[in-house]
Design a protein with these regions (language model features):
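Sequence signature of WD/YWTD-type beta-propeller architectures
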Residues: 16-218
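Sec-dependent N-terminal signal peptides
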Residues: 4-13
């Protein structure tokens, strides 16, 4: 038991020490080339972590700082995956203020810092969800698609409708009435071609096929 506790202690100690920024021995007089480019943007105070990648070789780290809170994220491949817990604490502390992000890169055993960039945190929360159609790039695999919703405070995604339930046909052109998630319409093509109207728990289908169109909606 003592050995187990000692190992746990070492793991915790290592986690704390690895979260500290390294000593900086030089400055790079330019902003880091990051993707996506979040430089100078304003974000809602409940947005999911803004993970990003930096175009540089070797070890890198990013130091996130606001009044009252700071943490460091390390990356061996230049891609930063920001921990949810640290990010949420940062946004709470930075509400109505800004976050400074310093990217450091290691060269020959010494760390150099790019010029910092900033993200402003709004006092307004983000809308809970965004809805979208998900389909493979280029539309080659159009027979595998669906309409999904993602929680914007996280990366949780769940289907509203997947076309595997409708004979793998095309589903498109969805919209909501005045941003009301309880009032929605979308179009279905091919075998079950129609417009689907959703009003709370009431669902209605409309056949818009005419003699002058090749199918419903077209």
């Amino acid at each position: 038991m003592k050995q187990l506790l000692f190992c746990i202690f070492l793991l915790l100690l290592g986690g704390c020490s690895s979260n500290q920024p390294p000593a900086v021995s030089g400055q790079i007089d330019e902003l880091p080339a990051i993707y996506p480019d979040y430089t100078g943007v304003t974000v809602p105070q409940s947005i999911a972590p803004l993970n990003f990648a930096v175009r540089t070789e070797g070890k890198t780290c990013a130091v996130f700082t606001t009044e009252g809170y700071t943490f460091t994220v390390y990356a061996s491949d230049g891609a930063f995956s920001i921990p949810n817990a640290d990010w949420n604490k940062l946004l709470i502390a930075a509400k109505g203020k800004q976050v400074e992000i310093s990217v450091l890169t290691e060269e020959k055993g010494k760390w150099k810092a790019f010029l910092p960039f900033h993200i402003r945190v709004s006092e307004d929360p983000v809308d809970p969800y965004i809805a979208y159609r998900l389909i493979a790039p280029g539309y080659q695999l159009w027979n595998e698609m669906g309409i999904y919703q993602r929680e914007l405070a996280s990366f949780d995604q769940e289907p509203i409708l997947e076309n595997r339930l409708t004979n793998n046909n095309c589903i498109n052109c969805h919209s909501f009435c005045m941003q009301d998630p309880n009032k929605m319409l979308f179009h279905v093509r091919a075998k079950y071609g129609c417009t689907v109207l959703v009003d709370d728990d009431r669902i209605k289908t409309l056949d818009t096929k005419t003699d002058q169109t090749i199918s419903a909606l077209v």
